Amino acid sequence: MQGIPSSLPPGAVCMITGEIVRYAQSMQALHAMVAPNGSVLSWHMGMLVARSINDAFATVMSKPELQWAFIMGDDHTYSPNIAVNLLKREKEVIIPLCLNRVPPMDPTIIEIDPVHHSRRLKPLEEMPTSGLYKLGPNESCGDAGMLIRRSVIEKSGPKWYERMKSGSHQAEDDEFVTKLRMLGYDVYVDMDNRLGHIGAVDFRPELVDGKWVVRCVGAGYRRVCDLKV
């Protein structure tokens, strides 16, 4: 990661990994990443993801000059300027479009049926092809690539991520996004800035002839195939 001259405020790229990094492609993306001058890399290692993110947010709060946090794990690929692009959207909470890395390879946006108490991933073909998508009242999402402003971190802490105990949520990031919604924050998905999610291959949402496909990218960034949705 390197700093670049920018009128945008500095922040922290919060890299959350185990003691051994899973995918080299993710480290290549981090190495190429750019952020406004004054930004820092806040790298936290360990098996407890919730604690690592809490530590990363605490690092942001300890440095008044840092005005945002960008959450990233070691199983994603992304463009070098993704944090800058998300900052330019001027939203309090925003994530890039990201797909599930196992079937169905739909966005990591969760639709909740309050009547039947059921959940499903939102189908990719139902998503717009550009601009920002605002989560609906019965939707949640993952936190991969989330850019969250300092003011939101201040209001939602100091204990940001809860370790799962009751089983009422599927994962800690789901619980955290639900907390943000309850505090009155809107959450946006940037359809023009997207993540790859590394599984058997790197699964990426791509537009082909104006329609969404799931692009499968192998080692060396070699395109394997496009899956229609």
Give the residues covered by each predicted segment.
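Short, conserved alpha-helix that lines the donor NDP-sugar binding/gating region
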Residues: 49-62, 177-178
